[in-house]
């Protein structure tokens, strides 16, 4: 069969890989061939439902995209996930957009406990950004579910863009598409104003949302961050790494040589130190299980996919082995499993954090 291309974005049409560029279901392809209008699923949803979905990029495409952003005189809006800051930082962004103003947007602010003040989170995000070599002109917290937060975000964008175009960038799974959909609703409510154009040298489209003064907001495709937990889970279990509701941190009083299993997705060992409380911040539905450190590995091997889930009994065959990261902690510190959540250590302790091979474990100043 001759190769078909999406008439929206130009990507080659394929029916195998749902996550890949140019995907369309077989039934939709057959309908498209009848009407002579073949769209990939992403463009179809954009055209008919005003709905933007994530698309996965190769590193090469990503570099081309960043070059274009860096070469333009524009405001760069960098969306990060407050729940997973380390997993949502774009490596090398400051290098590429050095001449542009960057507005840092902490998304999913409604996931953090209400007791945490916005000002504290904003300050914390600015500190983390500086550690990553970024110098944002401003930090704003938002949530696609909150209309007034979207209004605040639009006001900040207007304040800092100074008549320029705006590029929205972010990795996959930070909720960028949902946020852009909320922005479109806020600006217009009219789906016919959105157009797409091609990134130079790629088959990737950027979504164009016109502003009143003839400038545009450009939404760019989401960049894959390879060390996020999301890449190791099936669609059904993604909810554990992208909570939709306010997380309720739980504190566990642990003695040395006790272990806490995070479903079957990770593990926390308290190796040495005074008995103390450790505060776990994960999706509320993720079941945590306390046991003795001695024999914990055998316990995991026996119960993963059953008592310790996700992964379920089918998924566990494909799920990567857990790898230990030993750490000595001196004061209040978050131990983060990229894309899953974190455990706050409140005092001196020798600990080990186990995460699937390939998933990053990082320490940071406590956020809560």
Identify what each model region corresponds to.
Residues 82-86, 110-113:
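Short acidic, S/G/P-rich loop/turn micro-motifs used as interaction or catalytic elements
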Residues 87-90, 114-119, 227-230:
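Conserved ATPase-coupling elements of RecA-like P-loop NTPase cores
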Residues 94-101, 189:
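A short alpha->loop->secondary-structure connector
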Residues 103, 111-174, 185-192, 196-197:
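Canonical P-loop GTPase G-domain recognition
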């Amino acid at each position: 069969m001759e190769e078909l291309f999406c008439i929206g974005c130009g990507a080659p049409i394929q029916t195998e890989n749902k996550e890949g560029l140019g995907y369309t279901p077989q039934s939709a392809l057959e309908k498209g061939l009848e009407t002579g209008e073949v769209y990939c699923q992403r463009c179809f949803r954009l055209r008919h439902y005003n709905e933007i979905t994530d698309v996965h990029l190769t590193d090469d495409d990503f570099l081309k995209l960043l070059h274009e952003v860096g070469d333009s005189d524009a405001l760069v809006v960098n969306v990060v996930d407050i729940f997973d800051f380390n997993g949502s930082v774009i490596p090398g962004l400051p290098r590429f957009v050095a001449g542009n103003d960057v507005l840092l947007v902490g998304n999913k602010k409604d996931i953090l406990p209400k007791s945490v003040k916005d000002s504290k989170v904003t300050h914390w995000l600015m500190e983390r950004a500086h550690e990553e070599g970024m110098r944002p002109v401003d930090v704003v917290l938002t949530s696609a579910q909150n209309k007034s937060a979207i209004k605040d975000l639009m006001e900040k964008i207007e304040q800092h863009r100074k008549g320029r175009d705006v590029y929205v960038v972010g990795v996959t799974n930070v909720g960028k598409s949902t946020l852009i959909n909320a922005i479109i609703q806020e600006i217009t409510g009219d789906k016919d104003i959105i157009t797409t154009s091609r990134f130079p040298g790629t088959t990737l489209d950027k979504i164009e949302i016109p502003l009143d003064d003839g400038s545009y907001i450009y939404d760019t495709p989401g960049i894959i961050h390879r060390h996020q937990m999301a890449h190791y889970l099936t669609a059904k279990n993604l909810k554990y790494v992208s909570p939709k509701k306010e997380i309720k941190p739980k504190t566990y009083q642990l003695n040395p040589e006790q272990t806490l299993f995070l479903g079957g997705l990770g593990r926390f060992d308290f190796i040495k130190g005074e008995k103390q409380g450790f505060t776990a911040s994960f999706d509320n539905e993720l079941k945590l299980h306390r046991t003795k450190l001695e024999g914990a590995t055998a316990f995991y091997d026996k119960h993963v996919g059953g008592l310790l889930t996700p992964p379920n009994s089918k998924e566990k065959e494909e799920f990567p082995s857990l790898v230990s990261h030993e750490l000595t902690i001196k004061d209040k510190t978050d131990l983060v499993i990229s894309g899953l959540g974190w455990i706050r250590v409140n005092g001196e302790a020798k600990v080990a954090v186990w995460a699937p091979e390939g998933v990053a474990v990082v320490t940071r100043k406590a956020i809560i």
